[in-house]
Amino acid sequence: MADKAPFDTDISTMTRFVMEEGRKAGGTGEMTQLLNSLCTAVKAISTAVRKAGIAHLYGIAGSTNVTGDQVKKLDVLSNDLVMNMLKSSFATCVLVSEEDKNAIIVEPEKRGKYVVCFDPLDGSSNIDCLVSIGTIFGIYRKKSTDEPSTKDALQPGRNLVAAGYALYGSATMLVLAGGSGVNSFMLDPAIGEFILVDKNVKIKKKGNIYSLNEGYAKDFDPAVTEYIQKKKFPPDNSSPYGARYVGSMVADVHRTLVYGGIFLYPANKKSPDGKLRLLYECNPMAFIMEKAGGMATTGKEAILDIVPTDIHQRAPVILGSPDDVQEFLEIYKKHAVK
């Protein structure tokens, strides 16, 4: 038997994958430019996250962002990286970031046809204790022929062209959803490229894990309380669901995608509109889930059907395996008619 080569000489990198998909779709190449630029930003953030302690990037930068979270030094760095790389891709016209109060309109000489909404460093409250954090993004096509403005970003999630997230965990993974489904890429630090490791990812029809912050249990809606009780104490004496909650949306949603189950950040008495942001947290994750065969809902409607009125709008979110989300919806509807 012939010896195997020391490494694969025909690897499918993310750059190659995106170029092939663009060619199949007869595209202009702008999406390829955009995603390649985003990839560069993710690689740079990954490096910064891993050497944060040495580079004194831990700690607070001394301000709060528009949604009231304390801004960490890494947040500022990550936001600048993503913002600068997207502007220089010549593929974007409007950029919405969790860290900026207003939408950023790209300079006329650098404009392209895409609108990008992103959270540069999700879960950053976990930075100091080395818990996995990530970057989330959603890409829309500009619909109007008018001068670019904030209203170009106020599109429902159904209009997303592509969405994804990067997870900075034991390895750096980039999950991308688009016309060809959901695909996962792992960063190979030896060659500095994202390598395709999972093609056409699908979520399990039903899982056995639930994920939510039970610290807010006293403020839960009755429907949420009943659903969680049912998972802990199944009426048919079947095995109870396991509970897993990191507190970093990217980490919790990624685990849900890989193992199946349900992730919940529902509305409660203190946060009647939910806590997670629609444009750059809920919509991209809902898009990925639906492309992987899962579901994503507020309880009242599909996440992707919400027409936003504000770039920092919040929404409740329940997403995951279709059977699990459907079971939650049945309980939710039962309580809604009471």
UniProtKB/Swiss-Prot annotation:
Q: What are the Phosphotyrosine sites (modified residues) in this protein?
A: Y216, Y245, Y265
* Cofactor(s) recorded in Swiss-Prot or TrEMBL: Mg(2+)
Report the GO molecular function annotations: AMP binding; fructose 1,6-bisphosphate 1-phosphatase activity; identical protein binding; metal ion binding; monosaccharide binding
Residues noted as binding Mg(2+) 3 in the record, renumbered to the chain: D119, D122, E281
This protein's GO CC annotations: cytoplasm; cytosol
Q: Which is a GO BP term held by this UniProt record?
A: gluconeogenesis
Q: Which residues carry this modification: N6-succinyllysine?
A: K151
Q: How is its activity regulated?
A: Subject to complex allosteric regulation. The enzyme can assume an active R-state, or an inactive T-state. Intermediate conformations may exist. AMP acts as an allosteric inhibitor. AMP binding affects the turnover of bound substrate and not the affinity for substrate. Fructose 2,6-bisphosphate acts as a competitive inhibitor. Fructose 2,6-bisphosphate and AMP have synergistic effects.
Per UniProt, substrate binds at: 122-125, 213-216, 244-249, 265, 275-277
Pathway this chain belongs to: Carbohydrate biosynthesis; gluconeogenesis
Quote the record's binding site residues for Mg(2+) 2: E98, D119, L121
Under Pfam families, the record lists:
FBPase, FBPase_C
Q: Does the keyword Phosphoprotein apply?
A: yes
Question: Quick one: which residues bind Mg(2+) 1?
Answer: D69, E98
The protein's UniProt keywords, in alphabetical order, are:
Acetylation, Allosteric enzyme, Carbohydrate metabolism, Gluconeogenesis, Hydrolase, Magnesium, Metal-binding, Phosphoprotein
The residues listed in the UniProt record as binding AMP, with positions renumbered to this chain, are: V18, M19, E20, E21, G22, T28, G29, E30, M31, T32, K113, Y114, R141
Question: What does the entry comment about cofactor binding?
Answer: Binds 3 Mg(2+) ions per subunit.
* SUPFAM superfamilies reported in the protein's UniProt record: Carbohydrate phosphatase (SSF56655)
Q: Which reaction does it catalyse?
A: beta-D-fructose 1,6-bisphosphate + H2O = beta-D-fructose 6-phosphate + phosphate
- Family indicated by similarity: Belongs to the FBPase class 1 family.
Q: Which PANTHER family does the annotation name?
A: FRUCTOSE-1,6-BISPHOSPHATASE 1, FRUCTOSE-1,6-BISPHOSPHATASE-RELATED
Q: Which NCBIfam families match?
A: PRK09293.1-1
Q: How does it assemble?
A: Homotetramer.
Record HAMAP family? FBPase_class1
In UniProt terms, what function does this protein have? Catalyzes the hydrolysis of fructose 1,6-bisphosphate to fructose 6-phosphate in the presence of divalent cations, acting as a rate-limiting enzyme in gluconeogenesis. Plays a role in regulating glucose sensing and insulin secretion of pancreatic beta-cells. Appears to modulate glycerol gluconeogenesis in liver. Important regulator of appetite and adiposity; increased expression of the protein in liver after nutrient excess increases circulating satiety hormones and reduces appetite-stimulating neuropeptides and thus seems to provide a feedback mechanism to limit weight gain.
* Name of this chain's protein: Fructose-1,6-bisphosphatase 1
